[in-house]
Amino acid sequence: MERYEVIKDIGSGNFGVAKLVRDVRTKELFAVKFIERGQKIDENVQREIMNHRSLRHPNIVRFKEVVLTPTHLAIVMEYAAGGELFERICSAGRFSEDEARFFFQQLISGVSYCHSMQICHRDLKLENTLLDGSIAPRLKICDFGYSKSSVLHSQPKSTVGTPAYIAPEVLARKEYDGKVADVWSCGVTLYVMLVGAYPFEDPDEPRNFRKTITRILSVQYMVPDYVRVSMECRHLLSRIFVANPEQRITIPEIKNHPWFLKNLPIEMTDEYQMSVQMNDINTPSQGLEEIMAIIQEARKPGDGSKFSGQIPGLGSMELDDIDTDDIDVEDSGDFVCAL
């Protein structure tokens, strides 16, 4: 890690700590996720790294490399200077329909690419969508800790994600299509951008997860009267929020929906993105064997010492599991901020 100097902390979670760093040589800024060596370097971490490494798209945070310190495994990635989309909504209250569409188009573009690479995200939410620092912000999907590759793994069965965003079939705890479940989560994200609240939470009891789950299973939601939403947008939401995953709208169908196509920037078209990916294909990345060797070494506990004053020994922060009795749901983020 001598190559990077730490600028500041930029986040923490059940994974550990994230820091903003600068490449000493190029002066380029990166975000680094530090995960304590030893037991925390599990299959989820390995899957996150391997899946993230394979993705190269303008709407996905770019993976750079993994580095080993005496105490931590460091995942170096593109820095999104605009922060979380979640924070932007908290500040704005809610978005206009045009602004919501602008971000939704980018979200669907990134998710569509993930699915084309046979990777479903399984934890799509506002906190996992970052923005770059440009005036017309580019959305960047991040955090592939729950992602599943249908090339490397069987169909998902586990109930993971954040309760407000989870699809009914995931809660049923049967085998499900992760791509179709991602569509539901995209719908929740769109709704929150438009309304400034979660579609399936009781406003009087937002922390009552059991009630939220009941509402999800019965697809009980409404767009409040005070929010002006076009009929085309309402139609799209009604096609996303369908309990039967086989009848739910697919990503390709969303990309052909009239509401989605309105004001679609040229860089969001499939033709344009294909040309970008072809140009990007020769960009060198850290080798697979090197990454696997680093992950394997990181499974051994660290030496417990501080690292050269630059990267201090870092603690980690565990989030409480949600108590939903017989339903196992993981809480991986904040829920609501006075929406």
Curated annotation (Swiss-Prot):
EC numbers for this chain: 2.7.11.1
Known function: May play a role in signal transduction of hyperosmotic response. Can phosphorylate BZIP46 in vitro.
PTM remark: Phosphorylated.
Positions annotated as active site in the UniProt record: D123
Record's comment describing the protein's domains: The C-terminal region is necessary for the kinase activation in response to hyperosmotic stress.
Residue span(s) of domain Protein kinase: 4-260
MF term (GO), any: protein serine/threonine kinase activity
PROSITE patterns attached to this UniProt entry: PROTEIN_KINASE_ATP, PROTEIN_KINASE_DOM, PROTEIN_KINASE_ST
GO BP field: abscisic acid-activated signaling pathway; seed germination
GO cellular component, one term: nucleus
Keywords recorded for this protein, A-Z: Abscisic acid signaling pathway, ATP-binding, Kinase, Nucleotide-binding, Phosphoprotein, Serine/threonine-protein kinase, Stress response, Transferase
Name of the protein in its database record: Serine/threonine-protein kinase SAPK2
Top-rank EC class of the record's enzyme: transferase
Organism of origin: Oryza sativa subsp. indica (Rice)
Catalysed reactions, semicolon-separated: L-seryl-[protein] + ATP = O-phospho-L-seryl-[protein] + ADP + H(+); L-threonyl-[protein] + ATP = O-phospho-L-threonyl-[protein] + ADP + H(+)
Ranges for region C-terminal: 253-339
Family from the record: Belongs to the protein kinase superfamily. Ser/Thr protein kinase family.
Domain of life: Eukaryota
Alphabetized CDD domains for the sequence: STKc_SnRK2
Binding-site positions, ATP: I10, G11, S12, G13, N14, F15, G16, V17, A18, K33
